């Protein structure tokens, strides 16, 4: 539900070549909010001539409502231009470890 809302909002704000959103909440020791930790990969030429900090600021500003309304605790952002993504050597960085406080299942 929240994932789709994030997708819908980003579709209105930016033209992108690639968008992936991962819900990483299950990797954390949280029982009351199954939508608390997200990771976003977005590739768009919108980011040309925008430094990494400003890319993140822009995306956070677009998604700020979700932090309060849905109590999102963590958002990791990977924002690239098309050329940066094409030249990226390792694209498997999306394998996040389990949270330190997450008990083994």
UniProtKB/Swiss-Prot annotation:
Of which family is this protein a member? Belongs to the BolA/IbaG family.
Q: What is this protein called?
A: Uncharacterized protein bbp_418
Pfam families under this entry?
Answer: BolA (PF01722)
Instruction: Tell me the superkingdom of the source.
Output: Bacteria
């Amino acid at each position: 539900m929240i994932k789709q809302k994030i997708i819908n909002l980003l579709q209105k704000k930016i033209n992108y070549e690639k968008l992936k959103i991962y819900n990483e909440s299950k990797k954390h020791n949280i029982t009351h909010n199954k939508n608390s930790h997200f990771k976003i990969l977005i590739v768009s030429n919108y980011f040309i001539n925008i430094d990494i900090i400003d890319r993140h600021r822009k995306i956070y500003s677009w998604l700020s409502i979700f932090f309060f309304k849905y109590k999102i605790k963590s958002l990791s952002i990977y924002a690239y231009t098309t050329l940066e993504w094409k030249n990226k050597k390792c694209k498997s960085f999306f394998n996040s470890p389990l949270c330190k406080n997450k008990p083994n299942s």
